[in-house]
């Protein structure tokens, strides 16, 4: 028995270090898994790697690894796997932080698939959730982006405002600029329909400023006063500290609305009828102006019956502050050469050379601008090979050059250009342009070589996908069927477009030219234009040409008040009767026209 004890003790001493060694070996080969993961970070491993780790865990840690796998799958654009992970996570008990990350990942996946509305429905954080600041920031940023992509600028601004508590001071100027960009992009109708909660004082202020700019844009002095008053009354609003540049520009304007205005137009002679129409439009707008100072004086002078020297004497005697006109190019040049006191001028034509050092701007119904806009319109419609068809002569060449230059600017390629002469030559010209004549000549040549008549049909060009025609309605009536006949069966016909020259207003020709899209002033493309009924009642027998001149006169009056803003505010736009007006570097008014389709009712 005595000999048994030492043996037992030695075995015990031997087993202890072996067990310890095995334990240490086990610890070194299988490191302890972390209690939690930082699931707010971007994934650093593949989705499959995270799934393998998740399968070895349970509870919250398993969910963490699955969420990281989900984020990795979305990053890899493996959406089938992402859907399976969503299904698996949906059966688990998730914390608010985990639910938030799952929503963010799901929304990002839907965003990448252009499912913006579904993505927004997915993002629905609860206000009571205790989350990391980074999660709230990502939530509001993502919702902002989704609202923008959905065209909902008001709600995009709401999300930006929610980011304010998380934004560093040196980044707040950028944040409020983004808010203003979203709110100020709302059109008149959208601003009128805005409904805000009483607690949304911040957003209410931005909407108020945008509304002032929209509703008072034609009354610069009132707008300036209103903006000043608002900023003084709301010193704690972000707009008072981070004032939008457009508002600063308006506040800096030295607005002096001229009280003595002269209208220089030909009221007799060759250009008398045009001058009278412009005059009527100008006075019409003046009478409609509720903001007009009762002391404003208008002096109308006939440039055909009065010498320019006499006119200058009258202007000085009457203390004229602003001149609208003349209408004729030579008279404009003569006025500018004698305008030693530099009276501000809005000329109603464009001289051959523009002197940017004098106090003059220019506004006219420019056919060259219309040609340039036609090029832009066709380009935006996706056409690649347009044909520009214009009448022979100086005008046709001038307009085709304007179209060609703009098309080259947009595409680095020149369009096809062709000119037509008399109506009797129209069909021959169309056949020539579309290659029918050359194709017919090749058929004759083949018949001669074969000494027999072969069965063959002339083939038309296939590359022309759009035709823009500078033509009267009477010419368009012939051009349309000639083009349709020239195109071989089975070939997609080119889309037909026309200038305002085609819009004569003659109802009898609408059937023949139905379907052709044309450009013109809004007053003639939109039957429901707010001023159309009133105009038709006052001038019921007006031709479309006379209506355009009347609209020119009305817009000229409005420009007298708005030119200071147009000069000071970048990208300023004015909705006029002749189109959307803006100003270029040479102080020439640029006119964006409207489009309509012959024979179709407008909205």
UniProtKB/Swiss-Prot annotation:
Organism, as annotated: Aliivibrio fischeri (strain ATCC 700601 / ES114) (Vibrio fischeri)
Higher taxonomy: Bacteria, Pseudomonadati, Pseudomonadota, Gammaproteobacteria, Vibrionales
Q: Where in the cell is it found?
A: Cell outer membrane
Q: Which residues form the signal peptide?
A: 1-26
Membrane topology, record value = Lipid-anchor
Q: State the protein's purpose.
A: Regulator of peptidoglycan synthesis that is essential for the function of penicillin-binding protein 1A (PBP1a).
The record's Pfam families line, in alphabetical order, gives: LppC (PF04348)
- Subunit structure, as described in the record: Interacts with PBP1a.
Does this entry carry the keyword Membrane? Answer: yes
Q: Kindly provide the name given to this protein in its UniProt entry.
A: Penicillin-binding protein activator LpoA
- Record keywords: Signal included? yes
Q: Biological process GO annotation list?
A: peptidoglycan biosynthetic process; regulation of cell shape
Alphabetic keyword roster? Cell outer membrane, Cell shape, Lipoprotein, Membrane, Palmitate, Peptidoglycan synthesis, Signal
Q: Which family does it belong to?
A: Belongs to the LpoA family.
Q: Might you report a single GO cellular component term? A: periplasmic side of cell outer membrane
Where it mainly occurs, coarsely classed, is membrane
